[in-house]
Amino acid sequence: MTYTATIRLYDETELDLLRPDPSKIAIDHIAIALSREGRYANQGRLVYCVAEHSYLVAAGCYSFARDVFDKDQEVFRLLQLRALFHDSGEAYLRDLPGPLKKLPAMAFYREI
């Protein structure tokens, strides 16, 4: 039996989460989705979206990397991008609260 897990994105693009086509993954999909997705299962005292979190991680990484990797611009840029996009998968697969993610029954989710 073949399963699909297709979702429709804001621009009507469809993406199969089990067999994602890289050509259908776009930076605007990521930016829009992460700006609408709250951290901490939306249970924080303040609204704190994943996009803001990603930006703050990248800004902190920039400060650190500037001092450590300033002479190696290639590593510096890659580290900044990695920091900015570290939660980009959440644009397509929502994040689960940590305690739930750790359950053995959720191994399939971690695999995806």
Language model features: what each stretch is:
Residues 1-112:
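Metal-dependent phosphohydrolase cores
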